[in-house]
């Protein structure tokens, strides 16, 4: 299945839109510059705290995107003082922990966020994706199932794509195909689902179908080393040595530091 770095793109994307309950005028915090809110003297303290919390997480997510982990962590921890049990802050903190190599702390924060938000499909999907990255694909499926059952989950196809890829890792081929095809029915260009379907078809010896999915994957998003390697293997099995070599040449050109790994 797609390696963890590609799953993380899906996982991190879900963190950048922070849902805020109980404050309709500030329903989402988005990454990017933001103006300081103007408060009325009649604003209750709880509203000011909530808006401050939201702004801190937006700024932290922006810092995290550009790799400024120290600043991101400071802002998230300040936000957590305002709302210690807010799952969105815990997810961002988990992402920072993961990037810093603090794997145990990352897992604890992802799990705590999921337990605090059992009806938030995005939070549940995040924890499932993290478990799969850590080599626990069977356990991850439990959390993907919960995400898919969450009411009002707007990006369920992403959880289906993750679930399908992780089911493939767990050796559950029938479930993998079911979830991946469901994801592609909604998001035909989902790169996680396309690459996983290429891998599934390859494992089943369906090399023409694997080629079709690999080509769709490469057209849908920037190529990664793993998908180029898979495409090369598919072409080799189909007897097209020239095409196989072209993919290997792309690896050498586009991923020179990884070409020999």
Which ranges hold each PLM region?
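N-terminal leader/linker segments that initiate helical-solenoid repeat arrays
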Residues: 22-77, 81-82
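Terminal, low-structured helical/coil segments at or just beyond the last alpha-helical repeat
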Residues: 27-44, 217-261
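TPR alpha-solenoid repeat register
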Residues: 89, 123, 156-159, 193, ...
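Canonical positions in the second alpha-helix
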Residues: 78-79, 112-113, 146-149, 182-183, ...
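Structural marker of alpha-solenoid helical repeat scaffolds
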Residues: 48, 82, 116-117, 150-152, ...
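Canonical tetratricopeptide repeat
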Residues: 58, 92-95, 126, 160-162, ...
């Amino acid at each position: 299945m797609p390696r963890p770095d590609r799953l993380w793109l899906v996982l991190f994307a879900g963190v950048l839109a922070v849902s805020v309950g109980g404050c309709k005028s500030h329903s989402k915090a988005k990454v990017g510059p933001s103006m300081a809110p103007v408060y009325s003297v009649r604003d209750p303290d709880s509203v000011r705290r909530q808006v401050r919390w939201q702004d801190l997480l937006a700024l932290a997510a922006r810092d995290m995107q550009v790799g400024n982990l120290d600043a991101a962590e400071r802002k998230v921890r300040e936000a957590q003082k305002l709302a210690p049990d807010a799952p969105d802050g815990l997810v961002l903190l988990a992402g920072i922990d993961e990037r810093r190599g603090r794997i145990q702390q990352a897992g604890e924060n992802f799990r705590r966020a999921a337990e605090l938000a059992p009806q938030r499909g995005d939070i549940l999907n995040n924890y499932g994706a993290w478990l799969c990255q850590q080599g626990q694909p069977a356990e991850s499926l439990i959390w993907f199932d919960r995400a898919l059952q969450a009411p009002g989950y707007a990006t369920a196809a992403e959880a289906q794509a993750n679930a399908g890829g992780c089911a493939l890792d767990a050796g559950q081929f029938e479930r993998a195909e079911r979830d991946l095809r469901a994801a592609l029915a909604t998001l035909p260009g989902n790169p996680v689902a396309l690459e996983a379907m290429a891998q599934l078809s390859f494992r089943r010896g369906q090399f023409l179908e694997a080629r079709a999915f690999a080509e769709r994957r490469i057209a849908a998003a920037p190529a990664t080393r793993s998908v180029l390697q898979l495409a090369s293997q598919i072409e080799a099995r189909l007897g097209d040595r020239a095409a196989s070599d072209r993919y290997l040449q792309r690896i050498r050109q586009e991923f020179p530091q990884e070409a020999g790994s």
